[in-house]
Amino acid sequence: MASQGTKRSYEQMETGGERQNTTEIRASVGRMIGGIGRFYIQMCTELKLSDYEGRLIQNSITIERMVLSAFDERRNKYLEEHPSAGKDPKRTGGPIYRRIDGKWIRELILYDKEEISRIWRQANNGEDATAGLTHMMIWHSNLNDATYQRTRALVRTGMDPRMCSLMQGSTLPRRSGAAGAAVKGVGTMVMELIRMIKRGINDRNFWRGENGRRTRIAYERMCNILKGKFQTAAQKAMMDQVRESRNPGNAEIEDLIFLARSALILRGSVAHKSCLPACVYGLAVASGHDFEREGYSLVGIDPFRLLQNSQVFSLIRPNENPAHKSQLVWMACHSAAFEDLRVSSFIRGKRVVPRGQLSTRGVQIASNENMETMDSSTLELRSRYWAIRTRSGGNTNQQRASAGQISVQPTFSVQRNLPFERATVMAAFTGNTEGRTSDMRTEIIRIMESARPEDVSFQGRGVFELSDEKATSPIVPSFDMSNEGSYFFGDNAEEYDN
């Protein structure tokens, strides 16, 4: 997708920068990553973690959550105004796992939020470094995307569980800024908007008064973000209708659900970034890597290279398969929860199996789980090839928006053809084309019907050897097209519940 003049690159959003050239972008992303790494090293020192304990992904997640909580202004203010049982508004903490006498022990720690934010700022040259915080949020969001299914959330908002591939970033906090908005899927934006409209239907004052004015601005901004993800004029026009509605109600919800369905064929532009756990950056900084000087990109070879020589461990429950745990984390690291499994398998160099076949639960360990039986193992996060992350959704040409790949939101810019039965998707569009958006609906359906399954996404794009850092000789994989490669089919994963 040719970048429009108005769009900043994702790295620029990531670092809050204005237009910069590639070198400047690489340097500022590097500065952000280096800051996370320095913070992590300092926290390991504070907590007196051994080298092994510092490489434990569960400890990394606790430390990341602590700093995110320390900087969550809104929640901190809310906690101070509504003192609830057992929540100290000034402190944050979580489980830290230590290896003692050959056993893993859980220790609950508590720190002053002020102390944590001081350490964070100190690691980031005295700045708030919001970009680094957002980066960690996106890593947590990618981990949730790979771990949980959102069927219940989809059904609650009147959407169809088959739309799960549109739900990237559905657990990202509202405060995740432009970089967060870029990685949200079409379904996620639709769901946020529907929730908002439903509140407006149930609460007469939602759109009224000073608060209502702010709500309205937020509503229109979310509509514009979603509009920016669509690539056809008809879809964009329909979003204008939804945005300009005097008082949004059921008609708008209908329109949004229609648009979400249409995104199964006419893919939205959703960014993908490889965001790694803080401990990986910490390890690299500790071994003397200067991220700012070397530069870093979230969408190129750098994260692959970092994972090639990082050893990260994970706690494993008694009946979990360590190889499956590794796959889960690998997918999260590369934001590949919604990628075609055949593409992922080729890049990883190991078969990536659908989630219903994984013998592993989430990475985080609940506080009531028995530590006696916990073991730990090395996560295998290396890959055979690397590929450029995409932000286009993989439609072959924007002018007549051909079919993107159903049940998949491509992560890697790698050529694949489109295994789908258009009839099954088109069945979702029978019936209602009347109402004020009828001409747009008709147009969208027409575009989808003329989308040719024999079109190829990412024509000529391939994967690269890990030695080919300049991406000079693409290897275009050929896939067995007999099976549709969705991670979510035949799924029995746990639901994501806050």
Swiss-Prot record:
Keywords: Capsid protein, Helical capsid protein, Host nucleus, Host-virus interaction, Ribonucleoprotein, RNA-binding, Viral nucleoprotein, Viral penetration into host nucleus, Virion, Virus entry into host cell. A motif (Unconventional nuclear localization signal) lies at residues 1-18. Its main location: virion. A motif (Bipartite nuclear localization signal) lies at residues 198-216. Late in virus-infected cells, may be cleaved from a 56-kDa protein to a 53-kDa protein by a cellular caspase. This cleavage might be a marker for the onset of apoptosis in infected cells or have a specific function in virus host interaction. GO terms for cellular component: helical viral capsid; host cell; host cell nucleus; ribonucleoprotein complex; viral nucleocapsid. The keyword Transmembrane does not apply. Residues 1-23 are annotated as: Disordered. One of its GO terms (molecular function) is RNA binding. InterPro entries: Flu_NP (IPR002141). It comes from the Viruses. It is found in: Virion; Host nucleus. One of its GO terms (biological process) is viral penetration into host nucleus. HAMAP family: INFV_NCAP (MF_04070). Belongs to the influenza viruses nucleoprotein family. Encapsidates the negative strand viral RNA, protecting it from nucleases. The encapsidated genomic RNA is termed the ribonucleoprotein (RNP) and serves as template for transcription and replication. The RNP needs to be localized in the host nucleus to start an infectious cycle, but is too large to diffuse through the nuclear pore complex. NP comprises at least 2 nuclear localization signals that are responsible for the active RNP import into the nucleus through cellular importin alpha/beta pathway. This is Nucleoprotein. It comes from Influenza A virus (strain A/Swine/Iowa/1946 H1N1).
